[in-house]
């Protein structure tokens, strides 16, 4: 534990995480200053009167006067104001680093381009099924510092690459990178390897590394084979096995669960289940409890979520697919009796969409593209694509042609902020329109 008494602390970024940082320092007798580049950030009205605040931009004088800056994951470390502070010797960390310095419970740490929230929640459910007290948070739901107030046997953290950049003291009992696909190109101008390097920090000082046998980018750079356990579709310590039309989860050759017993569907979710099972095994959660959780967990909203089944048509909300890799995962191995009606579009974040082309083949797919980068997506296969301005217009086109046996899938491969408040807002609108049009 670190003594912060007498330290001049600046917190950048409010919201739930920023407020948890304020509470953390006040509880330790330190009154921080707070700044946010937004004029009216969430949580501003909840700050104690003793806390000085600066909104609308960054206060460089405060930053250079600080001993410690706790920065929101949403603020790039490459920002000139932060670069100047770092060069002046000011320590810059994030809330996860604060958590790691204080935490006493074993930690399961989960990162990756796609599937993080599902696997994080699933490991938490496995621990609960075993009767363990468990805290689940980080980049999902509850801020990590809030979990410090709980007396948990296990902490399960979802960690983004941005959070890992400012974390130095993580010592996970088990850590995984689920996958690495192009994302956040605006924050990683040097490309995929720069993004991967941030993800790889999750393995530092980890007792066990859980790696994806199908994705070499998830492997530790330095030799850590003795600490590595793998999962994958066909290969890996934890893998899938198809027999007589049924798919089983297998661990080192032993069949442990028929996927028919799971509420989750889709090959990407089966590999998520394998990763969660490997993590749970690594920290000693009884296998029977983990398998029980796999049969009851129905998934998270906006993640390949069935929102309507009517007249033989299934409408699936995968709005959380905010990058190409996530949409590829949704489409990989997807089987549809009739025609797949795929909705793509939004803000592509300068991504390369060409990887989607192989999933858009055949005559049983129709593509509906919308939003800022809809034109680029429609160009992948113009003969089966229609371009509209909005998702609502695209869904109106879908509703005119769907037939029993068809599937309508919103898996946009793009961020939502060009037309929606969040991916949740986009997903809720999809569900509302499906109910209206289906």
Curated annotation (Swiss-Prot):
A single cellular component GO annotation: cytoplasm
SUPFAM superfamilies the record matches: MurCD N-terminal domain, MurD-like peptide ligases, catalytic domain, MurD-like peptide ligases, peptide-binding domain
This enzyme's EC code(s): 6.3.2.9
Keyword Cell cycle: yes
Keyword Membrane attributed: no
Chain residues that bind ATP: 112-118
Pathway(s) it belongs to: Cell wall biogenesis; peptidoglycan biosynthesis
Annotated S-S bridges: none
Subcellular location: Cytoplasm
Pfam family, one: Mur_ligase_M
One GO term (biological process): peptidoglycan biosynthetic process
Gene Ontology molecular function, alphabetical: ATP binding; UDP-N-acetylmuramoylalanine-D-glutamate ligase activity
Predominant localisation class: cytoplasm
Coiled coil: none
Enzyme class: ligase
Reactions performed catalytically: UDP-N-acetyl-alpha-D-muramoyl-L-alanine + D-glutamate + ATP = UDP-N-acetyl-alpha-D-muramoyl-L-alanyl-D-glutamate + ADP + phosphate + H(+)
Keywords for the protein's UniProt record, in alphabetical order: ATP-binding, Cell cycle, Cell division, Cell shape, Cell wall biogenesis/degradation, Cytoplasm, Ligase, Nucleotide-binding, Peptidoglycan synthesis
The protein's role, per its UniProt record: Cell wall formation. Catalyzes the addition of glutamate to the nucleotide precursor UDP-N-acetylmuramoyl-L-alanine (UMA).
Homology family: Belongs to the MurCDEF family.
HAMAP family cross-referenced by the UniProt entry: MurD (MF_00639)
Name this polypeptide is given: UDP-N-acetylmuramoylalanine--D-glutamate ligase
Record organism: Yersinia pseudotuberculosis serotype I (strain IP32953)
């Amino acid at each position: 534990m670190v003594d912060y008494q007498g330290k001049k602390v600046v917190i950048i970024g409010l919201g739930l995480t920023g407020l948890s940082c304020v509470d953390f320092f006040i509880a330790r007798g330190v009154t921080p200053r707070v700044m946010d580049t937004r004029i009216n950030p969430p949580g501003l009205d909840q700050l104690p009167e003793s806390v000085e605040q600066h909104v609308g931009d960054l206060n460089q004088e405060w930053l250079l006067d600080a001993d410690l800056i706790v920065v929101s994951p949403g603020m790039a470390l490459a920002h000139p104001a932060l670069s100047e502070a770092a060069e002046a010797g000011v320590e810059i960390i994030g809330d996860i680093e604060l958590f790691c310095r204080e935490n006493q419970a074993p930690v399961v740490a989960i990162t990756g381009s796609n599937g993080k929230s599902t696997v994080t929640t699933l490991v938490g459910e496995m621990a609960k099924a075993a009767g363990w007290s468990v805290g689940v948070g980080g980049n999902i739901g509850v801020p990590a510092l809030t979990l410090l107030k709980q007396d948990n046997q296990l902490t399960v953290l979802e960690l983004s690459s941005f959070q890992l950049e400012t974390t130095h003291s993580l010592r996970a009992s088990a850590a995984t990178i689920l996958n690495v696909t192009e994302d956040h190109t605006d924050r990683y101008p040097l490309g995929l390897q720069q993004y991967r390097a941030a993800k790889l920090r999750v393995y530092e000082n980890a007792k066990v590394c859980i790696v994806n046998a199908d994705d070499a980018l998830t492997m530790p750079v330095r030799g850590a084979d003795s600490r590595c356990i793998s999962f994958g579709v066909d290969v890996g310590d934890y893998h899938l096995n198809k027999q007589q039309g049924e798919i089983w989860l297998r661990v080192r050759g032993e069949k442990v669960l028929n996927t028919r017993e799971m509420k989750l569907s889709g090959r990407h979710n089966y590999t998520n289940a394998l990763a969660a099972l490997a993590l749970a095994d690594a920290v000693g959660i009884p296998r029977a409890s983990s398998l029980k959780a796999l049969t009851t967990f129905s998934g998270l909203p906006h993640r390949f979520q069935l929102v309507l089944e009517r007249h033989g048509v299934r409408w699936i909300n995968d709005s959380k697919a905010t990058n190409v890799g996530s949409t590829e995962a949704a489409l990989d191995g997807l089987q549809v009796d009739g025609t797949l009606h795929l909705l793509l579009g939004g803000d592509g974040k300068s991504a390369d969409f060409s990887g989607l082309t192989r999933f858009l083949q055949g005559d049983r797919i129709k593509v509906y593209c919308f939003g800022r980068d809809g034109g680029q997506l429609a160009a992948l296969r113009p003969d089966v694509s229609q371009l509209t301005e909005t998702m609502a217009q695209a869904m109106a086109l879908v509703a005119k042609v769907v037939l029993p046996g068809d599937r309508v899938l919103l898996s946009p491969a793009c961020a939502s902020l060009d037309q929606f408040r969040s991916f949740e807002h986009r997903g809720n609108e999809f569900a509302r329109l499906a109910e209206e049009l289906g």
